[in-house]
């Protein structure tokens, strides 16, 4: 009598489940790339004195916008004004990064550490 390996169906089901999880992870990654996250500084939500940084959920910056009053407030020949503008820009980027991290955790959190499976996924 030949041995038939009693758990062949279990392994096949496990591979199907792994493939399904991989597809879900890829979908979540694609959603992060398409998502728009806004980082603000200098006046809260999109005001005249606000710096806005546009990025996707994977922290790729797609644009930067300065409110209309920023140009009136900043003299690029004045070191203090340039430093203020740099600080506003960094604050907006960091705000966007924080929001992107939150979105990443929402999308990828259910997968735990599965991304570390290397070639298996």
Residue ranges and their predicted role:
Residues 1-43, 98-121:
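Long amphipathic alpha-helical segments used for membrane anchoring, targeting, substrate engagement
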Residues 88, 92-100:
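Stable alpha-helical structural segments in soluble proteins, enriched in small hydrophobic residues
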Residues 68-72:
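A short acidic/small-residue loop/turn micro-motif
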Residues 18, 59, 89:
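Residue-level signature of catalytic and energy-coupling elements of molecular machines
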Residues 45-63:
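N-terminal intrinsically disordered, cationic/polar leader segments
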Residues 8-9, 15, 74-90:
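Ordered, soluble secondary-structure elements with a strong preference for glycine-centered loop motifs
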């Amino acid at each position: 009598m030949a041995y038939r390996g009693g758990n062949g169906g279990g392994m096949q089901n496990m591979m199907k489940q792994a493939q399904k999880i991989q597809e879900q992870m890829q979908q979540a990654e694609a959603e992060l790339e398409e998502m728009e996250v806004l980082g603000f500084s200098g006046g809260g939500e999109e005001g005249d004195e606000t710096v806005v940084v546009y990025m996707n959920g994977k922290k790729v910056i797609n644009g930067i916008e300065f409110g209309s009053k920023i140009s009136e407030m900043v003299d690029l020949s004045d070191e203090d004004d340039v430093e203020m503008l740099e600080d506003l820009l960094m604050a907006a980027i960091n705000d966007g990064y924080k929001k992107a991290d939150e979105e990443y955790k929402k999308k990828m959190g259910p997968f735990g550490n599965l991304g570390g499976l290397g070639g298996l996924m």
